[in-house]
Amino acid sequence: MAIIAITGQKGGIGKSTITANLAMEMATLGHKVAIIDTDPQKSLVSWAELGEGFLSKYVQPLDTTHPVTFKQKVIALAKAADRVFIDTPPGFADQALLAALLADVVLLPAGPSPLDILAARAALTLARDARARRGGKKPFVRFIPSRVTFYTNLGKGLSSSLEDLGEKVLPPIGQRVAIAEAALTGLTVLEYAPGSVASEEFATLAKAVEELIK
């Protein structure tokens, strides 16, 4: 059993995209998954409602207004599913901290712009706070280079910039048309464009996260 929180203090960095597609890839590895959407705007729920694929079966909203109740529900889900994903909204530090306090792994997507790096630093501080409160062992914290344009200098240097913040960096996810098109249909990339570069990137990321959990 593992609880995986995807957090960040800035919007538009791919948190929901990574949550959805990483959960899909974990399911293909044989895991029973649950996906929790804590965003008041219900981004993942809205995505799932666009189609009748994987997300429509596994995404559920969960209110964080009452932390004790939230914790109880997450733990209950974790007993039924061996990979529980928590997608947190941007700019809501309380929700992100709450998720991090429950998580085995905190994933921090970050884009290549200077503002993205600053936001990643803030998200890292919060994740480390959660780890300190839990005795310094968990959650494991990893950056994910997200929405990367590999042909630009910013894109090429993103992994290095994130490593400089002091935590390990997982394989990147590129800025891919297939990702956006899949979301418009309510599907994950694996469902929409199996065998695509985007799908392969998420498969590689899932294997890296799986190794971390083991």
How does the language model describe each region?
Residues K32-V33, V84, P139-V141, V169-L170:
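Hydrophobic anchor at the start of a short beta-strand
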Residues Q95-P114:
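Inter-motif core of Ras-like GTPase G domains
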Residues A120-G135, S146:
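Conserved C-terminal guanine-recognition region of P-loop GTPase G domains, centered on the G4
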Residues V189-K214:
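NTP-binding/hydrolysis catalytic cores, primarily Walker-type P-loop NTPases
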